[in-house]
Amino acid sequence: MKEGSSSFNESARGPQSSPYRWVMLAILWLLYAFFGLAYRSISPLVTPILEDLNMSYGQMGFVLGSWQLTYIGASTVAGFFIDRWGIRWSLFFGSLIIALSVGLRYFAAGFGPLLAMVALFGVGGPMISIGCPKTIALWFQGRDRGTAVGIYSTGPFFGGALALIATNRVLMPLTGHSWRLTFAWYGIMILLAACLWWFLARDITTSEASERTGMKGILATLLKVRNIRIVLVCGLFTFAIIHGLTSWLPRILEDQGFSPTLAGYASSVPLLAGIPSLLVLPRFIPSERRGLSLAVMAVLSASSVWLILCLTGPLMYVGLIVYGIAACTLVPLLTLILMETPEVGAKHMGSAGGLFFCVSEIGGFMGPFMLGALVDWTGGFLAGGYLVVALSLGILLMSLLIEKQAVGE
């Protein structure tokens, strides 16, 4: 690749001082926003898909969590290759796979085909969610790094909110209430975002690129760090909570009497409420307070779930807002802890991010599946509330240990 067109020479000018880092952040945000749109796009369409394909709640729960299952297998390898191939090509490839996953749902004829198409998202997804922190680690440092993490983390929340609000309100009416055509249009949008990334993104040439360490050696070294192991456990519980509750939230609200359109609006409240906290907290919480902050967010998450499941009216909306503020902040805080661990840094952030998302998405898969299975067994979502509270308490206990560890700056 020609330098200056698709790569950035670190020796000529540090990327952390280049104004182009903000261009990188902008297109990274856009790409991550469409990642969120792709992930959330199926939730507001659960009801027509269930009716059209004659699926059970358990089957739909398995579909909702299927991409996390493939993600688990792909993420560790994806992180290793992101470190090797660079961010420009890797994120472009991931975006193409996501566009295919969403667009091909148009052809789903039953449980099996839909499962395969949603699961394909887990092949491309790791390139985006792991490539994002890798990009920030390369292009930003100091307090700007916390700011950048907060900003790019709002991307999937904007994209997810757009999917929840616009799917039943805009796209479904425009497509004659065809969930198939809705997926097709979303796939085209993601493809256009991928092309924009390809034309504007820049890789960084560093002096460390010549070092070659085997993937097993890198992962073994990372797993020896206690702080990293704690982050992995917290990530496992966090993703189970976030993916489990948010995947089923529109249906939970429909069971409480909301129309599909109103349920989509209400389901976007946590996403929108979390955006201000993402823009502020990652920048201003000092590294030595991140463990305590995780504990506080875990308690707030557990409390908000009970408000959502057990109450109606204004207090339920309070629960949605508190859940958005608390749950949306967990992953950025864990990412910063991981990124600033001395054994990780920018050099191994791809591999460390792959390890983090590999473990975390086990929870991301089990969350929607277990909540769907609990509905089949109990006839309601209350049992899932007990599960979410238990996981939140697990985060509380584990996050308190992070404060005792030294976090590298």
What do the predicted segments below correspond to?
Residues 8-18, 202-231:
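Juxtamembrane intracellular "pre-TM" segments in multi-pass secondary transporters
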Residues 344-380:
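A late C-terminal transmembrane helix in Major Facilitator Superfamily
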Residues 73-109:
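Conserved MFS/SLC helix-loop-helix module at the cytosolic interface between two early adjacent transmembrane helices
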Residues 117-155:
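Cytoplasmic helix-loop-helix junction between adjacent transmembrane helices
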Residues 151-201:
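Helix-loop-helix hairpin linking two adjacent transmembrane segments in secondary transporters
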Residues 289-337:
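C-terminal transmembrane helical hairpin of 12-TM major facilitator-type secondary transporters
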Residues 42-44, 226-278:
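Extracytoplasmic gate region of multi-pass secondary transporters
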Residues 40, 68-76, 161, 271-279, ...:
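Residue-level signature of mid-helix packing/kink "hotspots" within the transmembrane helices
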